Amino acid sequence: MNPLIIKLGGVLLDSDEALERLFTALDSYRAEHRCPLLIVHGGGCLVDELMHKLSLPVVKKNGLRVTPADQIAIITGALAGTANKTLLAWAKKHAINAVGLCLGDGDSVNVTPLDPALGHVGRAHPGSPVLLTTLLEAGYLPIISSIGLTHDGELMNVNADQAATALAATLGADLILLSDISGILDGKGQRIAEMTAQKAEQLIEQGIITDGMIVKVNAALDAARTLGRPVDIASWRHAEQLPALFNGVAIGTRILA
């Protein structure tokens, strides 16, 4: 059975109620299925909040956070520290054996600089499956932040959707991207059940898919092509539907290769 990577995003980390529902759903799924699970997360809302408190600017370019050298340590602390350990704490509350990691642990994901104009922002590439496979076989739930390391040891902020895609390629895993929205919406605000690359290009050209959603859709399309199977984009808000989603039932938008 392929491992399942669940990428968490949006304002989920700000809501105890949402985290309680999510981990209850994870607990329920793990009790009934033997499928190995991994969590990949960002934490943009936590980073934005911290930047505001420190009176530091938040700049995004094409949906990606610009990360100057003087901000990467702060962002690493927010993502690999606060966000990661918050999720680890929720796993512990639910008696789930979990391990908090970043992309650089065990060279699970290789990272290269994406664009000098973005600063410490990295591009994720498949890495070594050895560490994560060892943890999964021992029954652990890896919880992985989207902070990576270059071969030169430079800290890099990686878009969490792209990080999850690289991990899925590393492990041959299925992938679900959970966010604030119920899926990709058309121009009338209605959920699109299935999405192809051609349809995505049309909606981007029409200005219906914009900013961070372009990054998410492109990451999902890339994952579907790389893995040779569909990738789901769905909301964490409907916790009662999550066990079905984890079991392969589409509740959001299914991205087709």
Swiss-Prot record:
Pfam families xref list: AA_kinase
Domain of life according to the entry: Bacteria
Cellular compartments per GO CC: cytoplasm
EC annotation from Swiss-Prot or TrEMBL: 2.7.2.8
Alphabetical keyword list: Amino-acid biosynthesis, Arginine biosynthesis, ATP-binding, Cytoplasm, Kinase, Nucleotide-binding, Transferase
Record GO terms (molecular function): acetylglutamate kinase activity; ATP binding
Site (Transition state stabilizer): 7, 216
Protein location: Cytoplasm
Chain residues that bind substrate: 43-44, 65, 157
GO biological process: arginine biosynthetic process via ornithine; L-arginine biosynthetic process
SUPFAM superfamilies: Carbamate kinase-like (SSF53633)
Residues that coordinate or bind ATP: 180-185, 208-210
Chief place of localization: cytoplasm
Catalysed reaction, written as an equation: N-acetyl-L-glutamate + ATP = N-acetyl-L-glutamyl 5-phosphate + ADP
Keyword Cell membrane in annotation: no
Pathway: Amino-acid biosynthesis; L-arginine biosynthesis; N(2)-acetyl-L-ornithine from L-glutamate: step 2/4
Record note on quaternary structure: Homodimer.
Protein family membership: Belongs to the acetylglutamate kinase family. ArgB subfamily.
Role according to the record: Catalyzes the ATP-dependent phosphorylation of N-acetyl-L-glutamate.
NCBIfam families recorded: argB (TIGR00761)
Name of protein: Acetylglutamate kinase
